[in-house]
């Protein structure tokens, strides 16, 4: 019985596993490469202040669902929300002081490789 309980305990994190990466800026730049397992997701998150502009670009080995979101109480706001895209780019102009997450959901049965690049810009640039 103990072995079964231990195996179940070890299996649970694999079932709910998702990658959440904290943005660590390096001279106003952030880059990250990851492989998203089938039916899992990747989030890249960091604090932004109202008026901050972040240029973003990503490329995937296959399409995934992509969004940029932040939480307001129990609600979720989506400044960007795209379905079934393999690459995209744009600029987030932060509407409020908040933690923002760039998120990719892999709904396929194959792993998807993602490469993302973020660049901080001064407001108005």
Describe the residue ranges of each PLM region.
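Short helix-onset patch at the extreme N-terminus, typifying the N->h transition
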Residues: 6-8, 61
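Cleavable N-terminal signal peptides
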Residues: 5-6, 16
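N-terminal signal peptide c-region/cleavage motif recognized by signal peptidases
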Residues: 11-15
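Acidic, Ser/Thr/Pro
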Residues: 18-125
